[in-house]
């Protein structure tokens, strides 16, 4: 399983808020895409040397959001991300 500790933390967070009802595969995929777009937005209209500490902090937050939704979607389909990466490399 992909990062079981993170998945456990995420699932507890979701359960406390009664959000399971909203987490069908379609909504998980949409949320993953939306968060990925927020990563892209940080780099829009900038040059490489314009990425400052504030943007790096924002990037960290957005990457965490992407990881959150990626783990949930993978977990829904019992996909181990590390195994999928290994298989993809072959």
Region spans (language model):
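Flexible "arm" and connector segments at domain edges
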Residues: 1-63, 67-90
């Amino acid at each position: 399983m992909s990062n079981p500790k993170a998945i456990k933390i995420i699932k507890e967070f979701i359960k406390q808020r009664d959000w399971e009802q909203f987490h069908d595969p379609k909504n998980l995929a949409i949320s993953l895409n939306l968060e990925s777009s927020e990563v892209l937005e940080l780099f829009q209209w900038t040059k490489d040397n314009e990425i400052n500490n504030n943007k790096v902090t924002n990037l960290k937050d957005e990457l965490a959001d992407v990881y959150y939704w990626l783990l949930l979607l993978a977990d829904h389909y019992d996909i181990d991300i590390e195994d999928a990466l290994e298989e993809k490399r072959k």
